[in-house]
Structure formats: C-alpha cells, structure tokens
Swiss-Prot record:
Keywords: Ribonucleoprotein, Ribosomal protein. GO terms for cellular component: ribonucleoprotein complex; ribosome. The gene is rpmC. HAMAP family: Ribosomal_uL29. This is Large ribosomal subunit protein uL29. InterPro entries: Ribosomal_uL29, Ribosomal_uL29_CS, Ribosomal_uL29_sf. It comes from Verminephrobacter eiseniae (strain EF01-2). The keyword tRNA processing does not apply. GO terms for biological process: translation. Belongs to the universal ribosomal protein uL29 family. PROSITE patterns: RIBOSOMAL_L29. SUPFAM superfamilies: Ribosomal protein L29 (L29p).
Amino acid sequence: MKTTELRAKDVAGIEAEIKALQKAHFSLRMQKATQQLSNTSTLRTTRRAIARAKTILAQKQAAH
C-alpha cells in the first residue's frame, strides 16, 4: 500500500492494515522455513510495508 493511501486512512484503519501485514509476513516466514517460498523478496517488501504503516501511525498519533 502506498503512503498516500495510508495517510488517507484513520488510525483504526492503519492498525487493521498493520495486523493484516503482520499475518501475511508470518505466513511468508513459515513458507520460507518449510522451503515453500520461491520469491524471498516478498519478505523484505512486507517487512518494509509494516514499518511504513507503523511510522505513519506514530505520526498521526503524535499530531493529535
């Protein structure tokens, strides 16, 4: 998800997005551990998406 889309969401929406990304990241980690993941770059992508969402969430919470 792009930063502009995240910034348009409210705090609850961003928190829901973080939870969904964390579940996806966990699933990808399990696939990697069992040698089922062919494209390991998705781990990096989801990890950075989680960090991006957490940063925007912190900015929104600090602003209010």
